[in-house]
Amino acid sequence: MNPKISVIVPTYNAESYLMNAVNSVINQSFGFENIELILIDDNSNDGIMDILNDLSRKYENIKTIFLEENSGSPSKPRNIGMDNASCEYVMFLDNDDEYVEDFCKKMYDTIENHQCDIVTCRNYDVVKGEYQKYHSVLDKRPDFVKLNSIEEDPDLLSTTSMLIWNKIYKKSFLLEIGAKFPSGTLYEDVYFNLIAFMNASPIVYLNDYFGYIYNIRVDGDDKSTSQDFKEENLIKFYNGLNNIFNLLESENKHYSNFESEMLVGFTKWLVLTKSDDKLKLRFFKDFKKHYKRFSLFTRLEHIPLVFNIFINLGIKLMSLSDFTFKLVLKIAGLIFN
């Protein structure tokens, strides 16, 4: 057996849905014998250990790794997965998502044929069983885009381009640039991809291909992190965004649309998270210079234009002073909470 792609899957309390993810890899048209599947468990307390042990006994190309302490985010498991990957190429999968049947073949053929550092594609958002094609700046680009540098089209650094699991990476490239996921934060995938995209050459975008199924859990105690608006996650998002802004400053880079999109996402968390207003104000002050240069013309392709304008005006008003920040936050909270 000589696998060509290492697929890295961090797991945590995923007993009820992990096998959907695993089976989507096993059933790839690429041939499972061409895949090394690495499952890293972040000290789960459900019955997932038995599932992982059964898988590693059944398949010689499945590696299982168990962390003795919970790390609190997918970062450490993913980093360990990369350290243990033996293949030329690396892909990622979240434990509650799935690959489309030809995903690995499509990505492998593209990265081989075009000798890229990164290939990225589109994904389906699935909410309560309904498949949705997420709209983004990519809708306005050709079906196939090849860049020698992201500087050729920096607007492609949209938040949808920064997802970790709709891509294939050349492992030697990741090792060369020292790309790692930061611990203890969210936006960890954005930070990782920002380093990768600023250094990659070439990069290919498959804008007409939807290869990844992103299952968004919106109900109950088992919500997706992106839907779980609690103070602990707000703090992690703040830390993650701070890392991203610091990285851009250290590299003397400024990507207006990307930074504005990130601020919109963070502002959503400020509005929807039930937390101490003093904490929110402190976070706002820390990012005030970024709010000041927020582009009023930021276009969020996945929402209607009128709502987009409303959001942009709100953020510009917030940036004027502490008073307007509190006022807009209060009004938005009444509307959306």
Mark where each language-model region is.
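Conserved short acidic donor-positioning loop in nucleotide-sugar-dependent glycosyltransferases
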Residues: 25, 42-43, 95
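Short beta-strand/loop segment that forms part of the nucleotide-sugar
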Residues: 33-43, 65-67
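Short, well-formed alpha-helical segments that are part of the catalytic scaffolds
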Residues: 14-27
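Donor-binding/catalytic cores of nucleotide-activated saccharide
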Residues: 74-78, 95-232
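Membrane-interface aromatic/basic loop that binds lipid-linked glycans or pyrophosphate carriers
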Residues: 275-337
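Short aromatic/hydrophobic "clamp" motif used to bind/position activated sugar donors
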Residues: 90
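A conserved acidic beta->alpha catalytic loop
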Residues: 41-51, 69-71
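Glycine-rich, basic loop-to-helix element that forms the pyrophosphate-binding segment
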Residues: 67-85
